[in-house]
Structures are given as C-alpha cells and as structure tokens.
Amino acid sequence: MVSTFITVAKTLLVALLFVNINIVVGTATTGKHCSTGPIECCKQVMDSKSPQATELLTKNGLGLGVLAGVKGLVGANCSPITAIGIGSGSQCSGQTVCCQNNNFNGVVAIGCTPINANV
C-alpha cells in the first residue's frame, strides 16, 4: 500500500511539474532578477538532452517527462543569489543562470539560460 501511494505521489508530482514547465515562458533578466524568479547559482550546468542530465534526474527520483519541451540547460545544486554583500548567497563560484523551473529544492533546475550577473 505504501509503494502504491509513493507511485501515485511521484506521478502527480511529474504531472504538476510538466504543467508548470509549459506555463512558464521566457527567462529575461531585469536587474538582479529573472522573469522567472531570482538569479540562481548552479554548481554545474548541462545540456537538457545529455546523459548527465538524464542521470541527475533519475538519481533524484524525477522522471524524464519533466524535460518534455524544455530548451536550455539543466542546473545541479542551485541556490538563489541574494543581494550583493549579504550572506553567502551573494557570491557565485558556479554558473549564474535564469531557470524556467527551479522547484526541486535546489537539487535540480531546468530550462536554464546562462547569464553574466556580475556578482
């Protein structure tokens, strides 16, 4: 019974994520924000069609359906960049990006576009 619940929960999560991905369009930046939310700092970025992206999603329990129709990069270990000079989130030692969907608790962000945030 528990395994059935987990399977149903994963299926619903993938369906909701697919809807969110298709609703969000554009990743333009204005100031320190993207049109989709804060600028993110990802420790690693990869092509959404790469074996590394497939492995990252699979390893984190996400189905490949979350990439359906997604253009751009997949980010790994991402966090929002805060205002300059405030906390550890004010600097990025990885790649700064704007992502269409970063609702995976920082583990994965999809539909990312690299930017030069100068932070």
UniProtKB/Swiss-Prot annotation:
Disulphide bridges, residue numbers: C34-C98, C41-C92, C42-C78, C99-C112
Specify whether Disulfide bond is a keyword of the entry: yes
Span of the secretion signal?
A: 1-26
Q: Which Pfam families match?
A: Hydrophobin
What turns on this gene?
The highest level of expressionoccurs early in development when the primordium differentiates into densely packed, randomly oriented cap hyphae and loosely packed, vertically oriented stipe hyphae. In mature mushrooms, transcripts accumulate only in the transitional zone between cap and stipe tissue.
Which GO terms of the molecular function aspect are on file? structural constituent of cell wall
Q: Does the keyword Disulfide bond apply?
A: yes
GO CC field: extracellular region; fungal-type cell wall
Q: Where in the cell is it found?
A: Secreted; Secreted, Cell wall
Where does it mainly reside?
Answer: secreted
CDD domains on file: hydrophobin_I
* UniProtKB keywords: Cell wall, Disulfide bond, Secreted, Signal
Function, in words:
Aerial growth, conidiation, and dispersal of filamentous fungi in the environment rely upon a capability of their secreting small amphipathic proteins called hydrophobins (HPBs) with low sequence identity. Class I can self-assemble into an outermost layer of rodlet bundles on aerial cell surfaces, conferring cellular hydrophobicity that supports fungal growth, development and dispersal; whereas Class II form highly ordered films at water-air interfaces through intermolecular interactions but contribute nothing to the rodlet structure.
Which family does this protein fall into? Belongs to the fungal hydrophobin family.
| Subunit structure comment from the entry | Self-assembles to form functional amyloid fibrils called rodlets. Self-assembly into fibrillar rodlets occurs spontaneously at hydrophobic:hydrophilic interfaces and the rodlets further associate laterally to form amphipathic monolayers. The production of fibrils decreases at basic pH, while acidic and neutral pH favors the formation of fibrils.
Name of this protein: Class I hydrophobin B
Q: Which organism is it from?
A: Agaricus bisporus
Gene name, Swiss-Prot/TrEMBL: hypB
